[in-house]
Amino acid sequence: MTDVTTSTENELRELAERGAAELADASAEELLRWTDEHFGGNYVVASNMQDAVLVEMAAKVRPGVDVLFLDTGYHFAETIGTRDAVEAVYDVHVVNVTPERTVAEQDELLGKNLFARDPGECCRLRKVVPLTNALKGYSAWVTGIRRVEAPTRANAPLISWDNAFGLVKINPIAAWTDEDMQNYIDANGILVNPLVYEGYPSIGCAPCTSKPIPGADPRSGRWAGLSKTECGLHVS
């Protein structure tokens, strides 16, 4: 295994390019094994705690793997409960990342309900900036985004260089369909956020998440009525 902690950006970019070419048709398990082989303990798995599919798979490859959760201060109670259950059930180390300011401090400084007045700035302060800081300690991050989730994710690669955060990005289940997800959940008894079964196929912060209309893409319930469709973490 290459010591990625001393690798240059160009070397990591080249590694991502080689991986993308060699694993174009790889399974999720193969992608996770490739990640572990090349990055050892220097990668993190990001989870929004909608379900624990990726967490469970990663824990089988590397027990005790770091699992990053962005605790924005605006999550549903069910999401926080799922985070706590994930930490209790799976062999992982949950890294709970919080913004610089609490919601109360942000309200005092910028006014209440910034999420309604300027959702882009709210996401930047409570998601993008904290994630940027948290990822500085890693050479790669693994995410659970899937191509079927929204048009903005339709071309999500399996492995790439993430220009926004300056590290390698692996999306092991990018090619999975909703049926693939449900089959894996059923076959392995995976923890799922109870809100999923209440009609929320995409779960973010409570003030900015609603149930999508039938037939709409799963993320249409996020920032409903606004042109905003992504929080800034997954820039295509």
UniProtKB/Swiss-Prot annotation:
Show the active-site residues.
C231 (nucleophile)
An example Gene Ontology biological process: hydrogen sulfide biosynthetic process
Record keywords: Cytoplasm, Iron, Iron-sulfur, Metal-binding, Oxidoreductase
List, in alphabetical order, the Gene Ontology terms for molecular function in this entry.
4 iron, 4 sulfur cluster binding; adenylyl-sulfate reductase (thioredoxin) activity; metal ion binding; phosphoadenylyl-sulfate reductase (thioredoxin) activity
| Cofactor(s) for this UniProt protein | [4Fe-4S] cluster
Its UniProt entry gives the catalysed reaction(s) as: [thioredoxin]-disulfide + sulfite + AMP + 2 H(+) = adenosine 5'-phosphosulfate + [thioredoxin]-dithiol
Give the cofactor note: Binds 1 [4Fe-4S] cluster per subunit.
| UniProt: [4Fe-4S] cluster binding residues | C122, C123, C205, C208
Localization in the cell: Cytoplasm
Q: Output the CDD domains linked to this UniProt entry.
A: PAPS_reductase (cd23945)
Q: What is its EC number?
A: 1.8.4.10
Q: Does the keyword NAD apply?
A: no
Question: Without the gene, what phenotype results?
Answer: Deletion of the gene confers cysteine and methionine auxotrophy.
Q: Which family does it belong to?
A: Belongs to the PAPS reductase family. CysH subfamily.
Matching entries from PANTHER family are given as: PHOSPHOADENOSINE PHOSPHOSULFATE REDUCTASE
Q: What does this protein do?
A: Catalyzes the formation of sulfite from adenosine 5'-phosphosulfate (APS) using thioredoxin as an electron donor.
According to UniProt, the name of this protein is: Adenosine 5'-phosphosulfate reductase
- What is the taxonomic lineage of the source species? Bacteria, Bacillati, Actinomycetota, Actinomycetes, Mycobacteriales
Q: Which gene encodes it?
A: cysH
